[in-house]
């Protein structure tokens, strides 16, 4: 229990190889993750801004004839 088995060493070596093996591997992985998160946030902004624009356009129009007449009088 005190010493690590061979499978533990394989996992540790795999993590070390991922972190330090090759120039810029970790930074490219993190950069790709950041790009994915940014694209997701931009997609949410686009979706919510188009919904807000649709709601503003709909609310700007009078809903009934009485509201239309009130707007004409003022």
UniProtKB/Swiss-Prot annotation:
<protein>
    <recommendedName>
        <fullName>Sec-independent protein translocase protein TatA</fullName>
    </recommendedName>
</protein>
<feature type="transmembrane region" description="Helical">
    <location>
        <begin position="1"/>
        <end position="21"/>
    </location>
</feature>
<dbReference type="GO" id="GO:0008320">
    <property type="term" value="F:protein transmembrane transporter activity"/>
</dbReference>
<feature type="region of interest" description="Disordered">
    <location>
        <begin position="51"/>
        <end position="74"/>
    </location>
</feature>
<keyword id="KW-0811">Translocation</keyword>
<comment type="function">
    <text>Part of the twin-arginine translocation (Tat) system that transports large folded proteins containing a characteristic twin-arginine motif in their signal peptide across membranes. TatA could form the protein-conducting channel of the Tat system.</text>
</comment>
<keyword id="KW-0653">Protein transport</keyword>
<keyword id="KW-0472">Membrane</keyword>
<dbReference type="InterPro" id="IPR003369">
    <property type="entry name" value="TatA/B/E"/>
</dbReference>
<keyword id="KW-1133">Transmembrane helix</keyword>
<comment type="similarity">
    <text>Belongs to the TatA/E family.</text>
</comment>
<dbReference type="Pfam" id="PF02416">
    <property type="entry name" value="TatA_B_E"/>
</dbReference>
<dbReference type="GO" id="GO:0043953">
    <property type="term" value="P:protein transport by the Tat complex"/>
</dbReference>
<keyword id="KW-0813">Transport</keyword>
<keyword id="KW-0997">Cell inner membrane</keyword>
<feature type="compositionally biased region" description="Basic and acidic residues">
    <location>
        <begin position="64"/>
        <end position="74"/>
    </location>
</feature>
<keyword id="KW-0812">Transmembrane</keyword>
<dbReference type="GO" id="GO:0033281">
    <property type="term" value="C:TAT protein transport complex"/>
</dbReference>
<keyword id="KW-1003">Cell membrane</keyword>
<dbReference type="InterPro" id="IPR006312">
    <property type="entry name" value="TatA/E"/>
</dbReference>
<comment type="subunit">
    <text>The Tat system comprises two distinct complexes: a TatABC complex, containing multiple copies of TatA, TatB and TatC subunits, and a separate TatA complex, containing only TatA subunits. Substrates initially bind to the TatABC complex, which probably triggers association of the separate TatA complex to form the active translocon.</text>
</comment>
């Amino acid at each position: 229990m005190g010493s690590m088995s061979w499978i533990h060493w394989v996992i540790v070596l795999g993590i070390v190889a991922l972190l330090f093996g090759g120039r810029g591997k970790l930074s490219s992985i993190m950069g790709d993750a950041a790009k994915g998160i940014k694209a997701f946030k931009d997609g949410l902004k686009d979706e919510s801004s188009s919904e807000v624009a649709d709601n503003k356009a709909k609310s700007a129009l009078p809903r009934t004839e009485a509201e239309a007449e009130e707007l004409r009088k003022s």
